[in-house]
Regions:
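Ligand-binding clefts of soluble mixed alpha/beta catalytic domains
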Residues: 1-478
Length: 478
């Protein structure tokens, strides 16, 4: 039974957790008096409610900032309470969820607040890759507090009241909030790669519950399986038409059609998210060139090329999956790298990070080539050569250096249209045909699109006990 006093902060916790499961820790803690503290003001719980509870029966630790107490500012004891929650979570191996609504550091406590706040950074860093960390921003999250969600694994921002920034929009050189509201949920979700989802408070709390139910409790949790009520050999009807919007393809492959997408508004040419296959959580990375809304209206996202943002998004996601022993499934449909000045600034670095993430990951990795797979963009997308354990390809897929018509124009420059068409057809059959890739061992099995679910489930079942030795080192440097 919760002992938390009724407030917005407490109500958020009650909405997040299973009914009557929250137990508050440190309710009596209050601000320490310093030279500039307004000691006559009451500060219940020092502006943050901390404790533990369960989501679908799984233990989680929670802290929720109370903006009605000293504006939710972070003081020394406020920060120490959060750090204490991290200590407990690390001891027992359970996720930490932060519900943020904060006006920043408490000015009156000066360096006491700063030093205690640094403890939060340290605890988050120690917890990274050990327990899942999730942040939801319901009010202001500015200045140094903005680093907190950056150190967590998943971040959600309330679409109207949520404000996430290091420097306010008006403090940015040459900018005003009316020109570009860089602290808004929309900007942060589309431009920074930090935010996984936006919505109302109710929607965000529901998304967190769904996410927690799909994640392991810690990096050594081998029991995060759910009973599968779906047919393991189910035929995926109409999946062959989903090469453009692979979010739909992933839903068709998943148990009961359930796919949880992360960072949907950022780097939209790449999809990342979680699904279950035979009850086990799998992380998915897929190329996307188009999307469909609820009414079936199509939106073009890219020309089939990989962007720098998409590569960075994939890299971060694969690193998370590898840290928590979550197998990785990729759906490949990519024709090259996006050729714009903006992308070129970060393309090599971002693709390098993605390749490093795929190649370094020791979890089971399965790749399905669902469309065109050309050039080094194909190689970077979890190909056999960078470490995929199993590679499948639809019988309609293509794998090669480049599009056949472009190759013909390069090799037979100056030839007439008839000759170019003939040579392009010849090149497509000999070099881009999926049979050629299979003959060289780059593809393990050519499959029909509708059989994708049973093949990937079989592959992950076979790879369940995978062990892989790597050269001894402290960590990579990419």
């Amino acid at each position: 039974m919760s002992n938390a006093t009724q407030s917005v902060a407490a109500a958020r916790i009650d909405s997040l957790l299973d009914a009557n499961s929250f137990v508050e820790i440190g309710q009596a803690v209050t601000a320490r008096a310093t030279d500039f503290n307004m000691t006559e003001k009451k500060a219940p719980s020092d502006g943050v409610i901390t404790g533990y509870g369960v989501i679908d029966g799984s233990l989680v630790y929670v802290y929720s900032q109370d903006a009605s107490v000293l504006n939710g500012t972070v003081g020394e004891m406020h920060a120490k309470k959060i750090a204490k929650i991290y200590d407990l979570a690390l001891k027992v191996g359970a996720p930490v969820i932060g519900l943020v609504d904060c006006a920043g550091l408490r000015l009156q406590e000066a360096t006491d607040a700063l030093e205690a706040f640094g403890e939060i950074y340290l605890k988050q860093t120690l917890a990274s890759g050990v327990i899942p960390q999730i942040t939801a921003v319901f009010g202001t999250c500015g200045g140094g507090m903005a680093v907190v969600p950056a150190l967590t694994d998943f971040t959600f921002v309330e679409e109207k009241k949520g404000r996430l920034f290091v420097n306010t929009p008006n403090a940015l050189e040459g900018n005003r909030v009316e020109k570009c509201d860089s602290a808004s949920a929309q900007f942060q979700s589309e431009e920074t790669g930090l935010v996984d989802g936006i919505g109302t408070e109710e929607e965000i709390l529901g998304q967190i519950r769904t996410l927690v139910s799909m994640l392991p409790e810690n990096n050594e949790d081998n029991d995060s399986f759910k009973e599968c009520t779906d047919d393991l050999n189910r035929v995926c009807d109409d999946i062959a038409g989903c090469t453009g919007d692979t979010a739909i393809a992933l839903s068709k492959i998943a148990d009961n059609g359930e796919f949880f997408e992360t960072k949907a508004a950022y780097g939209q040419d790449v999809i990342t998210g979680f699904l279950r296959l035979n009850g086990a959580t799998v992380g998915a990375v897929a190329n996307r060139s188009e999307s469909y809304d609820a009414d079936g209206n199509k939106t073009e996202i890219s020309d089939g090329t990989l962007s720098a943002r998409g590569a960075r998004k994939a890299a971060d996601f694969v690193k998370f999956c590898d840290a928590f022993e979550i197998p990785v499934l990729t759906l490949t449909n990519v024709t090259g790298f996006k050729a714009t000045l903006c992308n070129e600034k970060m393309m090599a670095k971002s693709v390098g990070e993605m390749v490093h993430a795929f190649a370094s990951a020791t979890v089971p990795k399965v790749n399905v080539v669902v469309g065109k797979a050309y050039g080094t963009a194909y190689v970077a997308m979890n190909s056999k050569s960078v470490g995929a354990d199993m590679v499948y390809a639809w019988d309609t897929a293509e794998i090669g250096m480049m599009d056949a018509s472009l190759a013909a124009k390069i090799m037979y420059e100056g030839a007439d249209a008839s000759t170019l068409n003939e040579k392009a057809a010849e090149y497509k059959e000999l070099q881009n045909g999926i049979a050629s890739a299979a003959a060289r061992g780059y593809v393990d099995t050519v499959i029909k699109a509708e059989d994708t679910r049973k093949y990937v489930i079989g592959a992950f079942e076979m790879l369940f006990t995978k062990r892989e030795d790597r050269p001894s080192k402290k960590h990579g440097t990419v």
